[in-house]
Amino acid sequence: MLQGVSDLSIKQLLLGVNNVGSVHLSDIPSTRARNFLRGTDPTSFKQTCRALEKIKNSCTESDFKKALLFVRSSSLFDGTEIGQLFIDRCPNESNELDVKYSLSEILRYINQFADELIVLSDCAAKIIKHIDKGNYGTALDYCSNLADMKGTSVFLIRQLSYITNRYQLLELDDSEILRKIDYMKQRISLSRSSFLEGAVTQLSNLRTSYIATSKRIQDIKEDFQGKEIAKSFVQPIPSNLHEFESVLSDYFSFSLFDAFLYIAKFQSFSLQYLPSNQLDVDLFLSYKKISSIKFSPEKMYKTVDEDAGYYYFRESFLFNEQKGALRFQSIHGYYYYDAFRSNLKNLIQKQLVNDYFSNVNSLEQLKYTNSDNYVVKSEKYDSTTCGMLENSTALIHLLERKQGKLDTREQELFVELMSYTRDVGEVCPKEILATISSIAQCFRLKLVVNCLITINNKTQVSEHQLRSTIQDYCIEKFGGDLNLLIQHLYDISPAVAEHLLLTCDEKFLATLFRIVDRPVDAIKVRADMLYWYGKISSEERYLDRAKMLKIDIQINKEKGTIDDSRIYVDPFKYTQWFEDQMVGKLTMAIDNLLISEHAVVNPNWKHMGVGTTGDVIELLLACYKEFCDNKSFGIASYLGRRIRHGTFEGTASTELKALYTNEEYKHLFEDKEFATKFDEWLNQYELMISELKKNALQIKSKRKPSGCFSTDIDTPQKKIVADQLIFEILRIYSKRSGVIRLPSVIIDYCWRLVELDLTATKKLLSEKKSSHGVFSYTPKFGSSSYKRQYSKFSQEVNSLTSQKFGLMASWFNKPNYASPSTDIYLLFNAVISEVKDSFRDFEPKIDQGQRSFTINGGTYYVIYDALFVLIHNAARHGKSDGKMNFFVSIPEDRTNAIRLQLFTELDSIDSVDKALSNIEEALLNTQGDADEFDNKSGMKKLKKLENEGSISELQFYSKPEENMLCFDFHFELDSRGKYDDLDS
């Protein structure tokens, strides 16, 4: 490595920092605290953490600070993962030793170790210098040198990420660079600080959503080392002294070098709340060596085009010691940060924004077309050279100044600007967009703005407005032809046309009832739109999707308003889980695979840690396991609520048992030999059904080894599908929309994997039908007429088992989500029919007239579940031929909910009172697994639906004069619930 005489000298000096003069054990006033440290093995991270936690909990804050500083400055504890003021390896962030230091406390240490910091700064400047020149191998040598001198820091992590990005974006072909990157990650034990590593990687990854990643970081509530550092990557300029000290303290907890760089950066930036000239002159001059080097976008990217400003913005926190980078990030980040923290205004950044856009006063001054010359500027907005990012923030700046009140000409310009802006729907305040929509003088603008509103504000009201606008515009101008509407918008703005195309998926189109007559028509319209757009844009993925939809139209018959393929995984909740828990880990693993020294894709699904694809495989297996095993939105939730809670057994056996009392066959059971044989057959049949329910129709696990649904890639057919998933992910990942498409691609392939188990499940049901579902009896004596009666009975039994097993097999078809909309009264009728399959005597007197109430979206499964619980209980405990009334209405004080009321008749007032008592008892005990409460799990489920937000205002009461039991609840139109253990 590159080490000069001064470097070696400072290395030796830093190895013995404790001798320079810092906190000594005797400086800690508390005898108790000193004794805790004396009894600690300084090489043990756990013991040292435990001792410091005891001091934190039993001594004063001052004692704890001094004890922690003693550990961080003493050479005795140099090997522990807690870290030191100067470190050669990253500290372990998994500790609860977070403590806040003041600016004055940290400055004291910076001035005390000024000489050491100056030499580290000189080495850091060499790293920056060689990066700027494109000498990445030499820069990595100096990175190693910095670590050897105990200069491991967040600064070093940022530079490693920057070099990694250059390798990918510039498409370098140098295995030595990859080897050095891998070596440095191991050298500094980067995995100890996995949260910071992930934050740096994901924020600067140009394929991931910047807003989603930033929001996840800003929404972190718990305190831990590194949290404030990560937040400073998103919000680089602190609003006040308290915020500044909070971030500074977190940097100080990582390394003294990082704390020095943070103070120096803002001494150079001249924040009003910070005293000037806090640092020694020589220290500040050493910092200037780092900050004076300016990275040029021309060197950073292969081409400088309309997206270069956005790319530069995404990466600027990696090198924001450079004043221009800090300024550029602060100006444009102001609007991105404001998108999810609108209640917090940073006045310092606001002043920078006003200065940057001071030369812009009207929409006519913005950019409307591509150009040949692009320059990323941090001083002033320039429409002649700006890219899409700068043009977008300029537009939002003007919209805020005008409060969304645009004149006729500006309304036309707003639509045209959609072809040269980005992220407007996510970043522009929704109030501004709502104002523009309310004053829009033409359908075109209203359509564009309502599309933008639904991007970041998907409520029942906003989607209704968008549907209404699309239908009004389409009917008035294009005779109801959506394809002509898309083509017209494409001539105005390809970006708007593409956005509308993505909005108008099959589910959305099925709700355009004025121009799409039937749900199946939505598939055809969607296919036509995708085909046209694929042709005009030369995008094969749109053409492929169009072909698949047209095939679906041919092979799938219209199933009515309710999909009878009952198995279901909620794609919304799964995507939410994926974005919260998996997207960061998976993108980092894919990046590591793509830049690894031996990037060979060799999937091994049984030994995840083998080969370079091991991390990716492990994470994809976790995605598949969640898809199957999650008890709220996965396959397991369906198996729990639909198979194991009564439907399966009732459907399989109820009508067979009814044959005992059937007038046509009742006399046959007077034959004891026949009755005994049928009893034995039915007993074996029911044992088989019970075995299926308890052991086969389960997620396979150690407890359920015979489960039909495996979360492993355990068959050759599954391996083929899983291998295709990896190659598909790698294929789309390099594209701009790759990361956004990951959830839908993974869901699609998860269904392909599950479909193999579904096929095996249906095969198993068929085998069980053949082995246990066939009854035959021929009496030894009697006339031909007499024997024909037994033969007819056997045919009746076998016909019933064939019918029921065919029905149950259909429950394990891969679902078609093309039309998730239905009339709630039809939904009610479907539940009645299903419950009748389990209770043959259940014939309620229903009077619902010609009422109808249409609801769209996959959420009607919640209504289905709630009604099933209530009607199933009514059939079991109520009057089998009693009155039943069902009403749907909109509450007067609510716009985002519907009210559902169910009235069921019981045999007597005593039965009503008993039912009320049983319900109250059931609702008192809503803890535990639903399987443990066979008779009460229904009421428990209703309570859980209420607790997780899918329904509300759940209440029950009686009408004594009519012997009626009444259930009343609200269904929340805006809620998809939380992904907790809802259906356990």
Curated annotation (Swiss-Prot):
Q: Print the keywords alphabetically.
A: Antiviral defense, ATP-binding, Kinase, Nucleotide-binding, Phosphoprotein, Transferase, Two-component regulatory system
Enzyme Commission (EC) number: 2.7.13.3
- Maturation and modification: Autophosphorylated.
GO terms, biological process: defense response to virus; phosphorelay signal transduction system
Chain positions with Phosphohistidine modification: 645
Molecular function terms from GO: ATP binding; kinase activity
Q: Does the keyword ATP-binding apply?
A: yes
Quote the catalytic activity from the record.
ATP + protein L-histidine = ADP + protein N-phospho-L-histidine
Going by the record, the broad EC class of this enzyme is: transferase
Q: What does this protein do?
A: Sensor-kinase member of the two-component regulatory system Detocs that confers resistance to bacteriophage. When the system (DtcA-DtcB-DtcC) is expressed in a susceptible E.coli (strain MG1655) it confers resistance to bacteriophages T2, T4, T5, T6 and SECphi27. Detocs inhibits T5 infection leading to growth arrest but not complete cell lysis, during SECphi27 infection leads to cell lysis.
Q: Which protein are we looking at?
A: Detocs histidine-protein kinase DtcA
Organism of provenance: Vibrio alginolyticus
